[in-house]
């Protein structure tokens, strides 16, 4: 994050021949809407709370999600996301990222692909985003699914250069994106994703914390 003209000049001096885009930082809560589209219409599947790393050079890096996201602006987000997705010409699943300001949701970007929230969306609604994707590409959109529970996921990152000795597949289904035993990770590299579910957001996050504690015993 560049805070003044001096910092921008210093940053530009590091990459003198590389063009860059300067964007204003929007303060608020990071969120997203998962949609599926058929090229001219779209359906919102889920509203997600996004978890960011929060410090250092990776402060704005994605590190997990909670689905569903119960927020007073959820309805506005859904309406905007469906309009954007329908107008994009995309077919299949796509995500629209938001930052929720004090009074309004700000659209940040459109991701025309399977999103990082796919795990929590599928766990929360009991649906298959892949099947929704296939059907949408054939022209058929689903009804908006009912949320069956809350789902939370967090990515664990290496706190130093390390080699993972453990076979984490034994911890499934609370882990995903499972690396091979013996994989080398540089500091700050993503190692594995950990999930938790519950009847409420608080319960899902509590389960996630317990599962992370269990997984950390094998990640050292």
What are these regions (language model features)?
Residues 1-7, 200:
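Alpha-helix N-cap recognition
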Residues 16, 27-31, 89-94, 150:
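Short, basic and Ser/Thr-rich N-terminal targeting/leader segments
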Residues 24-83, 87, 111-135, 145-146:
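ATP-dependent carboxylate/phosphate-activation module, predominantly the ATP-grasp catalytic core
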Residues 32-34, 95-99, 184:
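Short, surface-exposed charged micro-motifs
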Residues 37-42, 100-104, 158-160, 199:
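Short acidic-glycine loop/turn motifs at beta-strand connectors
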Residues 90-102, 145:
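A short glycine-rich, hydrophobically flanked beta-strand micro-motif that places a catalytic Asp/Glu
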Residues 131-220:
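Peripheral (often C-terminal) accessory segments that flank ATP-dependent C-N-forming ligase machineries
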């Amino acid at each position: 994050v560049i805070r003044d003209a001096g910092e921008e000049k210093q940053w530009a001096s590091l990459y003198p021949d590389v063009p860059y885009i300067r964007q204003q930082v929007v303060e608020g809560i990071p969120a997203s809407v998962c949609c599926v589209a058929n090229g001219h219409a779209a359906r919102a599947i889920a509203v997600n709370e996004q978890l960011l790393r929060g410090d250092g050079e990776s402060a704005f890096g994605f590190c997990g999600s909670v689905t569903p996201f119960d927020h007073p602006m959820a309805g506005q987000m859904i309406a905007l996301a469906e309009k954007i997705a329908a107008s994009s010409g995309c077919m299949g699943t796509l995500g629209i990222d938001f930052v929720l300001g004090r009074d309004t949701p700000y659209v940040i970007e459109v991701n025309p692909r399977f999103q990082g929230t796919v795990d929590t969306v599928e766990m929360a609604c009991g649906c298959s985003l892949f099947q929704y994707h296939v059907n949408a590409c054939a022209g058929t959109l689903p009804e908006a699914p009912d949320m069956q529970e809350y789902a939370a996921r967090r990515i664990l990152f290496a706190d130093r250069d390390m080699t993972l000795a453990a076979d984490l597949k034994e911890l499934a289904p609370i882990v995903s994106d499972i690396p091979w035993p013996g994989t080398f990770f540089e500091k700050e590299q993503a190692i594995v994703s950990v999930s938790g579910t519950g009847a409420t957001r608080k319960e899902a996050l509590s389960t996630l914390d317990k599962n992370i504690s269990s997984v950390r015993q094998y990640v050292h």
